[in-house]
Amino acid sequence: MKSATHRNCAFFVRKIMYYQFRSKETTNKEKGNEMKKAIEVNNLQKKYGDFTAVNNISFSVNQGELFAFLGENGAGKSTTINMLSTILPKTNGTAYVMGHELGKDDDNIRKEIGIVFQNSVLDGKLTVKQNLMTRGAYYGYDKKEIMKRLEGLWEEFNLGDIWNRKYEKLSGGQKRRIDIARALLHKPSILFLDEPTTGLDPMSRKMVWDYIGYLRKHDNLTIFLTTHYMEETAEAENVVIMDKGNIIAEGTPAELKSRYTSKKLIWYTDESEESSKLIQHAGSSKFRYEVDHYNISMNEGITEFIWKNKGIVKDFEIIKGTMDDVFLTLTGKEMVNVNG
């Protein structure tokens, strides 16, 4: 019969191997083939007199991906979207949207994009039907064509239960649902979402993201997202972080976390006195006591540290940094209730 010590060693070996495997698996998932570009931006600039709102930024967005644009109010996110969607003229630089050059082929760019603005452009006094019919006519479709285009959105957006209700009477989540449906009427290749869940309660936010997930899965849309909810970047293939008109970081969520945050180790012991010894061994004063365990930041050697102290540690977890940690590291500011 195996001893308790033997069983404990086997437990730690399995758990350490699990964390090492998960780290490699995450890295492998991020490696992919070169993809076609939906958007290519080179040294794009927007100035208002002497003030530079967007300062010579360059990035690209692959077709079919969710691309997240992060930054505080005034960082330049919405200005960038407004330039790429032809609403604002650029000052300098070049950009291509689905192969069409910004400033030279704007009519074709507008055919390729749909935009959900932070503030809705729909009329609160009109019903959902009236709003969508009006918008469809704006694209040059007759009633029959509009209804045909809405057929594909009818079920997935649950339009039937709110079809004849006034827009102003809808809940926040329902309004966003119709805003997205409006932006998809002409079947664009790219959907710009400018702070799509700002002001929504958690349930409505989840509803919006359920619809976005459905669209990504079934329509292969390229989605360009601006947000201040860090958890909304979790599914993004690539993230760009802006501050004061400049790009200060870019990469996959995992790359940014690896580059700008530390892993955290949480261990569980029976006695606080034993944890105090572990903290001394770790050589760090940055820890947090939570009931019966400690949380300590360590950059390297976590698994070695745990193995060395397996006689004291009863269980452990290794927690990666978050996108909130990334933003805090880069800017020294917490991303709380910011937008724009």
Tell what function each PLM region has.
Residues 133, 137, 144-162:
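Conserved ABC ATPase "signature" region
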Residues 166-170:
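Conserved ABC ATPase signature
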Residues 187:
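Conserved catalytic motifs of ABC-family nucleotide-binding domains
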Residues 191-194:
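Catalytic Walker B motif of ABC-type/P-loop ATPase nucleotide-binding domains
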Residues 250-251:
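ABC ATPase "signature
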Residues 264-334, 340:
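Short, charged/small-residue-rich alpha-helical element at the C-terminal edge
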